Structure formats: C-alpha cells, structure tokens
C-alpha cells in the first residue's frame, strides 16, 4: 500500500471513530487518496458519502448535515481554489458554532512558490475563522516507522475533532485539516495481507476527549419587570419559563406553560431588566431595548462568547439562579400585549388585498406538525415566521444565523433534511425567498448515485427580488427611482424551468393552496413556488404597527 493511500485510510478511519457520519466529497486529482478511502468507507456502511461538484455548495450541505444530525460533518476537496470556495461556509460555522471539518488535499510543500499547477499557500488560508489548523506531514514510505506514523496521524485527527466539537472549549466550530499528498495518488494493487494500520480496539478513538462542562451560574432577581430575549443558540432554562419571552424561531421551544411575547409588543411595554439568551439577531425593537443604558441586561450563553453590541450587559453566565418573584400584574400585562400584537398581525394580513411573504410564512406556519423540521431563509422568511407567531413546539427550526447570509440556503436545507432523517421520521419544510433560491440554485444538483432527502419541500416565496429592502431605509419612497434596481434586484427567473433543469419536481400554487399541498403524501425533493408582492410590504407593516 503506497504512503498516501495508507495515510488517507488512517485519517478517514479515525474521523469515523470520532463521530463523523456524513462526508461531502468534491472531486479532484490531488485528493484522490481521500476519495478512495471515503468511497471504501461508504461502501462498507461506515459513513454516508455525498459527492458534489461545487465546493461552495458542498460546504453548506455539510452545515445542514451537521445541524440536522447533531454531529460533526466533514467536507473534502482538492487543492487550490477548491479550498477557497469553502470560505463562506467556514465563516458561517465559526459564528454559528457548527462543527465542520474542512479536509483539504495539498501539494507537497516543496512545490509552493515554484509555479506548480493548482498550488497555493492554503495552509492558514482561513485565518482566525477556524478553531484550529493542522497539516499532516507528507506520508513516508518507511515501513519500519509505520506504527509511529499511524499514532501521529490518528492523534492529529483526534485533535481536529476535539477542536471542531469544542470538547475542551465548549465552543464548536470549523477546523482546517490540510494533508499534503505525494504521488502515487491512486491505490496500488494491494500485496497479499496489506492492511490499514489499526486504531484502538473496539472502534474507540485514538485519543478520547470528553466534552467539557461549562457552567457559570449567575444570580438574577426576578422581582423587577423582566423580559427574556431568546436568540439563536439559546439554551434551555426551565426556571425562566414563566417570564414573558420573545423567542426567535431558532431558539428552543418553550415548555408548556410558557409566556410568549410577540416582538411587536415590546415597544408597548417598559421592562426594567432583560435576560438575554443566546444571540438575538432579528428584531429592531429588541436591539433598541438591549441598547437602553437604563435597562440592565444579563447575558446567558452556552459557550465562552456572549453578544453585547451596545456594551450594555451587566453580567454574564450560562444559567440563572433566580431570586425574587415576578410581579403578577407585569406578567398579565405582557400576556395581554402579546394577544393584542398577535391579533393585529392576523387582522392586517386578512385585510391586505395582496399576497406577501408574510402571508406565505403564515400559511407554512399553520401547516406544520410536531416532528417536522423547518429551515428558514436568513432574510425575510425567518423574520416573517417570527412576526406571524410561529409555534415552534414539537418542531426543529434551523436557519443560518451565524453571519446571516442568504448564500447556501438550498444546500443547507438539503443537508438538514438528510441529517434529520437519520434518526427522525418527520418531514423537512424549507421557506426561502426567490433571491435566496436563485443564489444557491446549483445546490439542487444531486447526482443520480447520491443520497436524496426522503421528504423535503422547499417553499419559494417569489416576489421577484429582495423584499427585505422594502422595509429598510433603502426602501424609503424618496429612493423609489433607483432602489428597485440596486437593492430590489429583480431577476425574472423562471423558477419552474430552473427546477426542471435539475430534474426537481415543482409547481406554482396560490398561498391558500399551500397548506393542502404541504399535506400531500409524497417522497423526495420538491419545490412549491408561491408568487408574492413586495411593493406593498412597507404599507402592510405600517398598517400592523398602526393597529398596535
């Protein structure tokens, strides 16, 4: 067995021992030893391999696999620009704390700076965006040192896994595992008895690192009028369930008996303190409250970092030790304002003459059932889901909130469905906008030999452009002569034709047909397109606020 083949097989074996169950592979020549090793592992049932031709979409597919299955995912590619195309996925997983292993092949280091083809300084390319960067030395044809090399390779692989999963830091994220490979890059005809150097007995990892316990209790007096803001990555806090809580869709669902608070109700109240869980990213009234120097903020997070955009947090921790008792009149008033806000949204949606993204979100939210997984686009869809009062009880809600880009969302949804279906029988529904869909339409390319989701429906709310800008300062009527082109970016793409090009089932329906369409029995991947209007979004949101 040649050295590159041996090294690749050892690394793949140790990744599997460390918990990797899904690997996305992008084709190339330099990463051939890894590709052969991964194919062998897939054929033997040790991993599930997903082959993709585009490294950018492959990275987001791996993100979806990781969050859907709750396990580290790996994406493997060749050298050069193939590595650079992982940049967006690496940045997203850094801030979203998703365990992603970028497994790149490299040229032998003596070729750097020589003008050799497809060669660049890729070690360290991701800089501070990764938790760790490790390069294995070139595999040597030294049988007498094989035991030592085996130990070194397996130890390095375990170090990568520990960094990716945050086993010693409580801060999961991406890592870059770079492996220079020398020719021959394809397996030799194995001599009789040639075997991969073994790992630990009984399939154990070479170096086991138990997950760190990160616990910082923080005492908080609840006698002041308190609201809870639960953002992305919020933990579960049963002792705060009675407090009025603005929960973003990706926050854990509140237990029964919770006290939900609609985000539009917040300006109608005067909280005296805030408990912030995770990282809020969606609502301007929330940002304004967190920036109010007169309102103390207590930040509870599940890792070592905490958000504090305005510098207003007074204390941080991981869980609350509560004292004092909430004022019943405060709880009652919050519940009343929540009902008022929910009713205002519902009434204005019913009165509005045109279909908007909010109407599509409301239809999707009403059609979901316990056990479903929901993937939301990072622009208007995740905000619309919050505004229409999505009930997340019994659901798993995903959205790329790390840096909240629209890129890679189709691939993330496909990966999330594939990952979720490993251990769950529920379906996956994705709600995304048309720009998000078009931006990552190449994610629809799933080869005929590749795993396909059992039940994934992508709902495209198509208002022919960037509807979110209608609601921002750029959408002010005084910019109407230019904003549609430079912010709205209409594209006139035929979504159905695009789906047909990738052999994906699709149809265009009206918003009132959406619940029935989502309930239809079926399998595989399909796209439901709902035409929506964005020109009246500003008017609709103004009407909702006026009704409050």
From Swiss-Prot:
Reactions performed catalytically: isochorismate + 2-oxoglutarate + H(+) = 5-enolpyruvoyl-6-hydroxy-2-succinyl-cyclohex-3-ene-1-carboxylate + CO2
List the CDD domains hit by this protein, alphabetically. TPP_PYR_MenD (cd07037), TPP_SHCHC_synthase (cd02009)
**Gene3D superfamilies on file:** 3.40.50.970, TPP-binding domain (3.40.50.1220)
Q: Which residues form the signal peptide?
A: none
Keywords, A to Z?
Answer: Magnesium, Manganese, Menaquinone biosynthesis, Metal-binding, Thiamine pyrophosphate, Transferase
Quaternary state and partners of this protein? Homodimer.
PANTHER family in the cross-refs? 2-SUCCINYL-5-ENOLPYRUVYL-6-HYDROXY-3-CYCLOHEXENE-1-CARBOXYLATE SYNTHASE, PROTEIN PHYLLO, CHLOROPLASTIC
**Protein name, entry field:** 2-succinyl-5-enolpyruvyl-6-hydroxy-3-cyclohexene-1-carboxylate synthase
The record lists the organism as Mycobacterium ulcerans (strain Agy99)
The taxonomy runs:
Bacteria, Bacillati, Actinomycetota, Actinomycetes, Mycobacteriales
